Swiss-Prot record:
One of its GO terms (biological process) is formation of cytoplasmic translation initiation complex. It comes from Drosophila willistoni (Fruit fly). Keywords: Cytoplasm, Initiation factor, Protein biosynthesis. Component of the eukaryotic translation initiation factor 3 (eIF-3) complex. The eIF-3 complex interacts with pix. SUPFAM superfamilies: ARM repeat, Winged helix' DNA-binding domain. Component of the eukaryotic translation initiation factor 3 (eIF-3) complex, which is involved in protein synthesis of a specialized repertoire of mRNAs and, together with other initiation factors, stimulates binding of mRNA and methionyl-tRNAi to the 40S ribosome. The eIF-3 complex specifically targets and initiates translation of a subset of mRNAs involved in cell proliferation. Belongs to the eIF-3 subunit K family. This is Eukaryotic translation initiation factor 3 subunit K. Residues 46-208 form the PCI domain. GO terms for molecular function: ribosome binding; RNA binding; translation initiation factor activity.
Length: 222
């Protein structure tokens, strides 16, 4: 869905154009930005700059604060881990937002993800599943982050553990994630995450430095 913002002069701009000028701080544009946040949740798209602009407008206009939009923005930030989007969004929250129970729940979920306690995350996510059921692709976005962490942590991993870390998924879903990440089976119970060729190899580099190259510098130090 295309979102156009109508300016005071009667002309229209795209949201991206509006965010590039002083109009981003105009509270008259908040409703259309909030609608844009809802569309991101529905269509599995993401625009961090627009979402941060919404939180900034709430800072300037606390009487216009919308908690449901706040939840959606924070949860969408979680879908873009391991990037630091959530930290930036959290820094823009008002005291009344920070005191909100649902905001605290989302912050707790973020902390759990950041310390890679994925089993606990999925347990908490199940308890709070109504909070993000409107966000298309939420679970798969988290699984993408889990896959990233697994890929940087393990060389091989047991299938049952991998299924647990990915949210207690079934075998067919596991197969799709193995294929997506170019992992491989090893026997019946193991998945190879990193092969020998993937490992970082050390390399000795010898650089020849001529005396003439540093002579002038040494002279200055005398």
């Amino acid at each position: 869905m295309s979102h156009l913002v109508k300016m005071e002069n009667g002309q229209s701009q795209t949201i991206q154009e509006m965010l590039g000028c002083i109009e981003r701080y105009n509270p008259d544009h908040l409703k259309i930005l909030e609608s844009y946040v809802q569309d991101q949740a529905k269509n599995n798209t993401y625009d961090l700059e627009a979402n941060l602009a919404v939180l900034k407008l709430y800072q300037f206009n606390p009487h216009m604060l919308n908690f449901e939009i706040t939840y959606t923005i924070l949860l969408k930030c979680l879908t873009n881990l391991p990037h630091t989007d959530f930290v930036m969004a959290k820094c823009l929250l008002l005291p009344q937002q920070m005191k909100d129970e649902n905001v605290q729940t989302i912050i707790d979920l973020a902390d759990i993800l950041e310390r890679a306690d994925f089993t606990l995350f999925w347990q908490r996510a199940e308890v709070n599943r109504t909070m993000f059921r409107h966000i298309t692709g939420f679970h798969d976005s988290i699984r993408k982050f889990v896959s990233h962490v697994v890929g940087t942590t393990f060389q091989t991993i047991k299938k049952d553990l991998l299924k647990e870390l990915l949210g207690g998924i079934e075998d067919p879903t596991l197969e799709s994630w193995i294929k997506r990440n170019s992992w491989k089976h090893q026997g019946q119970d193991l998945v190879v995450v990193a092969t020998q060729d993937d490992k970082i190899k050390t390399k000795n580099i010898t650089e020849k430095i001529e005396f003439d190259n540093v002579g002038a510098l040494m002279a200055q130090c005398l």
